[in-house]
Regions:
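Catalytic helix-loop patch of NAD(P)-dependent Rossmann-fold dehydrogenases
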Residues: 1-53, 57, 66
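Glycine-rich Rossmann NAD(P)(H)-binding loop
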Residues: 58-62, 86-96, 119-128, 154-160, ...
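Hydrophobic alpha-helix immediately C-terminal to the catalytic Tyr-X-X-X-Lys motif of short-chain
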Residues: 34, 38, 42, 74, ...
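Amphipathic terminal alpha-helices
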Residues: 182-194
Length: 194
């Protein structure tokens, strides 16, 4: 929802960046913005009780076999006995949240959130680079992290946003706190996969 921004500060619930609507990837943040606008309109027009939840990058043992995000590929590779192969330096900063923490955050907002408000779901102890996430899965799974050159097609599919970290103060003020940092979330993910 937030789009691209300047600077290194994490996104708060009231900060928005630029979305290039001619970029094919723009459909994702644009559709999320449209959904939130509909929620706000229904609250104002019909008095519908609405809370908005904005999760960061949620990971855990719930990914599908076709999910090609790094947070799904890395644990699948480790579980299959493979080393983790990275096709970039992995310097992009992301707010990761273990799936169980995300579930408790959603319940907290549904029960305690203020109607009409939006809440980021972010674990301040798991704001890490993609490389650091890969290192956590490699460490827990006893595998190596290997870097290879990306093909032109692979490079074209990368999300180049350097910093998509989120603040968590607003949801923490409701009494929520994350229980799993990146290392414990990686361990729990690998231990729960079949």
């Amino acid at each position: 929802i937030y789009g691209e921004k300047d600077g290194t500060l994490p996104y708060s619930e009231n900060s928005y960046g630029f979305v290039d609507i001619l970029n094919p990837r723009a459909c994702y943040p644009s559709s999320k913005r449209a959904a939130e606008t509909l929620c706000a309109a229904y609250k104002k027009e019909y008095g519908v009780d609405v809370v908005i939840i904005r999760p960061g990058h949620v990971y855990g043992p719930t990914m599908t076999d076709t999910d090609n995000r790094a947070s799904s590929q890395f644990p699948r590779d480790v579980k299959a006995g493979k080393n983790i192969i990275m096709k970039s330096a992995g310097t992009q900063l992301r707010s990761y949240c273990y799936v169980l923490d995300c579930a408790t955050a959603i319940l907290t907002v549904l029960l305690n959130g203020e109607s009409g408000e939006a809440y980021n779901v972010s674990n301040k102890n798991s704001v890490v680079t993609i490389r650091e996430m890969a290192e956590a899965f490699a460490e827990v799974g006893g595998k190596k992290l290997i870097f290879e050159e990306a093909t032109k097609a692979e490079s074209a599919s990368f999300n180049l946003m350097q910093n998509s970290s989120l603040t968590s103060e607003k949801i923490e003020a409701l009494g929520w706190s994350a229980q799993f940092d990146m290392l414990s979330g990686a361990r729990r993910t690998l231990n729960s996969m079949f």
